[in-house]
Amino acid sequence: MIEKIWFDNHILGKLMWPLLWPLSCLFKYVANKKKLDYFTGKKTAYKSSVPVVVVGNITAGGNGKTPVVVWLVEQLQLQGMKVGVASRGYGGKAPHYPYLLSNTTTPDISGDEPVLIKQRTKAHVAVAPVRSEAVKMLEEQGVDIVITDDGLQHYALQRDVEFIVIDGKRRFGNQAFIPLGPLREGLDRLASVDFLICNGEQPKTNEIAMTLEPSKAVNLVTGEKKSVSNLGELVAFAGIGHPPRFFDTLASLNADVVHTQGFVDHKAFEPEEIKNLMQYGEQLIMTEKDAVKCQSFAESSWWYLPVDASFPEEKAQQILNKIIEVKEQYGLSSS
């Protein structure tokens, strides 16, 4: 319901305005004060020995940050760089922090997105509620550069390049601060970052268009790959920031979806609640992020759909050139 208030101008937003507006003012004040403390030197931000690239947003919820992180890691690896990824590890509970993921780390330990990034890229991935602690651990691993998955508002960490990922369809909703609206920071923040990435729809001025390109569906048990349109009837579910985006993608691929089910982002699934979805059909399809949480109890009729971030070639090169330029300023060789 809260997202209907934020993005759909629901009547409940007007009814709850007297309650939510003062809380939004308080959120804005606290957020601005926290930021100002670092900008004025009242608090000291950690300066890494390697370049730090932040991929974040100014709204609550999922905007497509993780595919951007994966794309950046893979592109920089092709340049010969040893890349590390820092994350808060939301949804996981590690035995200690900072925590360095291994190839066998599960989402209940580190959260779903760090596991996805680790599996996709084989990069060093560290999690910690205080992201600067994760960055320090990655420095100990000898990385050349660190990318943080989210963390735009984590001003305790100095950064060299900033990305804001924008949901091209929902944009900034009612443009109010949390909890009346989705904003973590004001729209003026857009002018201070290096790159604005528009996920879907038509980008505005100074924004770079990004599309999420789906590939073939992958079977969770066998690893078999098939075109979504050839799978037959499917029950689709998604526990991401905006589940309808996933369902729209399936529709664009001519998937035969007979039932959809959205869950909250980062939800820890119980085996039975997923298996219960099979009452609507014999085959399930999910996002790659959900697949890492369902892998341990998956059945042979379950599939996931990987997606990859895609940018216009000229813009992609512009992004890479900026990061390489910053890295060279640190005096680090990419060979």
Curated annotation (Swiss-Prot):
Keyword match Kinase: yes
Coiled-coil region(s): none
A cellular component term, taken from the record's GO annotations: plasma membrane
Keyword Kinase: yes
Pathways per UniProt: Glycolipid biosynthesis; lipid IV(A) biosynthesis; lipid IV(A) from (3R)-3-hydroxytetradecanoyl-[acyl-carrier-protein] and UDP-N-acetyl-alpha-D-glucosamine: step 6/6
Sites where the protein binds ATP: T59, A60, G61, G62, N63, G64, K65, T66
InterPro entries, per the entry: LpxK, P-loop_NTPase
Family: Belongs to the LpxK family.
Name used for this protein in its record: Tetraacyldisaccharide 4'-kinase
